[in-house]
Amino acid sequence: MVDFLEIGRVNKKGYTEIYPKFVLKRRSEDLMIRGGDFYAIWLEDRGLWSTDEMDLTYLVDQELSRVSQEIRDKGNVVKTLYMWDAESGMIDQWHKFCQRQCRDNFHMLDEKLIFSNQELKKTDYASKCLNYPLEEGNTPGWDKLMSVLYSPAERHKIEWAIGSIITGDSKDLQKFMVLYGPPGSGKSTVLNIIQQLFDGYYSVFDAKALGNPSN
């Protein structure tokens, strides 16, 4: 169970009521708060962090269901206040806990690439991973394509840029790469391959808007 959650119990006439009890920690290892609101939760079964609040709701409700069943197995009646049930008020209690009672406690996620053959740790702060391993191999298709589209010198620049992303050096390099040329010269082809290489780790922006002084 995550370190910021306990299951509260109240004995009432004829039944037991259970509810999620959110616990303040000096520094939670399973929950991140950023800007006074939920940022991420650690999902042990996936070995990843998640910024999807519905994953948190599911995890809490799963724990409530487990405790509820334990009580029923002892022959007792139980009323469970689930997070998914808006009328229970538990989701409101959760938002109050995050926004009013917790201090910011977070580490930026996905600051480095994670490959499918990499053993993940919580302190890798990853919410995603690439669907292929990082390992040595031959690239005949890439070699053939690049030999047609680019000179050896230009190909070297592109592969150097890709390599800097893989090693993480690109975060400190004050450089960027621009592909230019007439239609059909392979710009989109190379960009599409790079996007596939770093699926989930790239974003798209409007270069014209970026250079507009009014923005």
Regions found by a protein language model. Give the residues of each.
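P-loop NTPase catalytic core of nucleic-acid-dependent motor ATPases
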Residues: 28-54, 58, 106-215
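Intein modules and their embedded homing endonuclease domains
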Residues: 1-125, 129
